[in-house]
Amino acid sequence: MKKYLGIIVDAVSRRQFKGEITVENGKILRVEEKEHDHERYILPGLVDAHVHIESSMTVPSVFARMAVAKGTVAVVSDPHEIANVMGEEGIDFMLGDSKRSPLKVFFGVPSCVPATPFESAGSVLDAEAVDRLLAREDLYYLSEMMNFPGVVLGFPDVMAKLESAKKCGKVIDGHAPGLRGADLETYIGVGISTDHESFTYEEAVEKIKLGMKILIREGSSARNFETLYSLIDEYPEAVMLCTDDSHPDTLIYEGHIDKLIRRGQEKGLDIFNLIRAAVINPVEHYGLNVGLLREGDPADFITVDDLKSFNVLSTFIDGECVYENGKVLFPMKKVPAKNVFNRNKISIDAAKLAVPAEETGDRKEGMRKIRVIVARDGELVTGQELAFPKVENGNMVSDPEKDILKMVVLSRYADDPVQIGFIKNIGLKEGAIASSIAHDSHNIIAVGATDKDIVEAVNRLVENKGGIVVGTAENLLDLPLEVAGLMSTLDGVEVASRYRLLNEEARKLGTSLESPFMTLAFMSLLVIPELKLGDKGLFDVTKFEFVELFAEE
C-alpha cells in the first residue's frame, strides 16, 4: 500500500482539493481530503485518442518511453502503417512489442489496407481478414475508415467491414476531411463515430451536431488546434485530443498531449474541459481500462508542478511509477528487425526520369502546361495549379528558382515503373529528400533539385532497405529504419537527434517547411485532397481518378 499527497484534480466532479490517494494492488483504494504542504498536483494520466505509433519512427516499446515522460498513460493506436507493409504479421509485431513497456496501448483493426485500390501495398486486409481481427480481444476498435466515397456509395467490402465492427460491438473511427451535407449524414449514419480530419471550425461543428466526436489533432505536420480549440469549451463532451502523426523530435522537444493542455490554458480554456478532452472522453468513448482517479479505478495518474506550466514530475501506470525526476523507470529491451523491401537500385535512364516536354502551338512558351501539386506547410491537403515546366535539352527538369521540383514515387515491393510528377512549395534549392515513409502504402518517395540528386537519394534508401535520406548526390545523410522501413529500434532520443540533423540539412538545402519529411510523406496519400502522386500515377483525389501530368488544352 502506498500513499500520495498533493492537490487532487478531480476531473469527473470538476473540483480541486488538498488530499491523499491510497494505492494498493494497482488500484486506487481511497481518495480523501487531507491538509498538507505539498504543492504538486495529482490528476489522471493523459490519453492520446488517435496515434500511429509508427510515425514516431520508433517501435512501440521505445515510443512508450517518450510518451510516459510527457504524462501519457495510454494511447488509442491504429497500426495502419505497418499493416500496409506487413499485414497481420505487422499488427502482431506491434502488439508484441507494446507489451515490452507498461504504457497502455489499445490497438485497432486497420480498415483500409491498402488505403485505395490505386496503389501498390505489401498487404491486403479484406473484409474476411478484418472480421477475423475484430473478433480478437486484443484489438479494440475499427480504425479510421478513410474510404469515405466507399461508405457514401455503399461499396460491399466497405459495408462488410462496418458490419463486422457492429457485430463485435466495437467503435468505428472515421476519417472524413471536408465531408459535409448529405454525404456526411450518410457517413455518420452507418455508425462511424469520430473524425480527426476536420480542418475548418464550421466543418467540425456540423459533424458534432450530427453526433460525431471530434478529435483535435496536433501532430508534426497536420496541426488543427489553432483552428478548433474553442470547441473544447463549446462542446466539452464531444471533443478529444490526439496527435495522429508525431515525429520523435516533436514528442521529445515539444511534448505530447501535455503540450495541448498548456496551450489550451494560454487560450483561456477551462482546465476541467481540457482534462475531459485529454482523458475522460477517450476513456469513455472507447471503453478503455484506464483510471480516472476514482476509487476502484486502475491507478493511472500523473503529478505536475502546477496546472499552468504543466511540467510532468511523475507518471504512474497501474500503481507503478514509470517516470520520475526526468528518468524513465522501465528498461529498454532489444527488438528484432522486421521488414519487407524488394526494390533494386535505379538509374536516370532506366527509371526514365528524363520526361520530354510536350509542344503546342497554342502557347507563347511553345509547350503544354503540367499539373503541379501545391504543398501546404502544416497541412495534409494539397492544392493544384497549372504551370509551364522548365525544359533543358527537350526534357522537363526541376525549377528551383520557381520552386517547382520533380517528385518521384516508386514501389518498394517490386521493380515497377517510376512515377513522375512536379511539386511546389518544398523549397529545395539543391539536393534531394527521400523517404520510405510515404502514406499509406509506404512506397519510396523523393523530391529533388536535379535528377542525379533524386537517383542517389533513392538508391541510398534501397541500400538501407528503408528510412529517410537528405543531401546532394555527393553528400547524403540518412536515418535507416530497419523495422518495416518505418521504425528504428534505437532509443527515442537518438532517433530524434538524428532526425533533427536531417531536418537541419534539408533547411540548409533551401526548404522552409516546418517538417519537410512529414510533409513529403503525405504527398502520396491518395485519400486526402487534392492532387497526389502514387506509385501508379498522378491522382486527383477530388475526382477519385488518375490524371495525366500534362493538362488538357
Curated annotation (Swiss-Prot):
Reaction(s) catalysed by this chain, per the record, are: adenine + H2O + H(+) = hypoxanthine + NH4(+)
GO molecular function annotations of the record: adenine deaminase activity
User: According to the UniProt entry, what is the EC number of this protein?
Assistant: 3.5.4.2
Which cofactors does this protein require?
Mn(2+)
Query: What's one GO BP annotation on this UniProt entry?
Result: adenine catabolic process
Which keywords does this Swiss-Prot/TrEMBL entry list? Hydrolase, Manganese
Give the family, as the similarity comment puts it.
Belongs to the metallo-dependent hydrolases superfamily. Adenine deaminase family.
What is the protein's name according to its record? Answer: Adenine deaminase
Q: Which organism is it from?
A: Methanosarcina acetivorans (strain ATCC 35395 / DSM 2834 / JCM 12185 / C2A)
